[in-house]
Amino acid sequence: MATAVTTRLEDKYVTIDGLRVRYIEQGAGPVALFLHGASLGSSADVFADNIARFADAGFRAMAFDIPGFGLSDTPAQQTVKAQRDSIPKFIDAAGLGKVALMAHSRSGGFAVELALAEPHRYSHIVVLGSGNLLPPQDEGQAARHQEAQQRADQMMAEKEPTLEDTRKLLQADTFNHALITEERLKVRNSRSVGQNFRNHVARQSAPQGGGSATAKPLWQRLTELKMPLMMIYGREDRAHAAERVALLKRQHPEMNIHIVPNCKHLVPWDAADEVLRLSVPFLRS
């Protein structure tokens, strides 16, 4: 079982569209760029331990705060499209060239969309717990899951979270609660209050369109990707993830998909060892 590794990485910045965008990095070698999700408190800090592990394995491991999250500046428009488009803009601003994307939660959909549109920019895609890339079990399930997520986001927008509120949110997304160290808890809470909380509230009323240029669900387009794809999910993740992974695997037995036991939605934490073990040979292929 994964154990938390305490790291402190230097905050660095690039400028994107006039916004100061913060990132963290460690190591040298091929670039593995970690992308955080959209929940309240999400930031590059989610991957601090993963970055240290991948750096030790011979990669230049990086993560950045999407504008409107973490320590990055707040954009005038906090749309889904703007969040997605910040990824190639960051890659260009940091002068990274071709990169592998390690995408958690909603950013998994971003990674697939970007890779479909500009395949020459991305060497590999690793998806970590992205429910938006799994087929529904029945016709109405996708809509129900989206409504449930919207309700959860709206509830989190009702009041600024206390430290204990943040602990409960993390406990809901992790199987191994011992991974929620006091340091991780304080960092997550600090990324959930003040301007970050106001940004979260603003995102609830921002236009949510523009995430995909086609009406075809992304899970139906995974086989169109021109680069290697690997998907890792937690067996205990929400929204029937394990059953939907099994459904996708039955439809496409050739796909590189893994289910990790004793793991919920925070795959980078619960499955840190497995993510490293599976990803290193995959990224070197």
Locate each region found by the language model.
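Alpha/beta-hydrolase fold catalytic core
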Residues: M1-F34, D56-F59, L96-G97, R284-S285
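Conserved HGGG/HGGXW glycine-rich cap/lid loop of the alpha/beta-hydrolase fold
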Residues: L19-L71
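Active-site loop/oxyanion-hole signature of alpha/beta-hydrolase fold enzymes
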Residues: A48, D56, A63-M102, R106, ...
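Flexible "cap/lid" loop of the alpha/beta hydrolase fold
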Residues: V112, L116, I125-T162, K168
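Conserved alpha/beta-hydrolase catalytic His-Asp/Glu region
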Residues: K159-T223
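Short beta-strand/loop motif that positions the catalytic acidic residue
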Residues: L225, M231-Y233
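Acidic catalytic loop of the alpha/beta-hydrolase fold
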Residues: R235-H240
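Catalytic active-site module of serine/aspartate enzymes centered on a nucleophile-bearing elbow/loop
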Residues: P253-S285
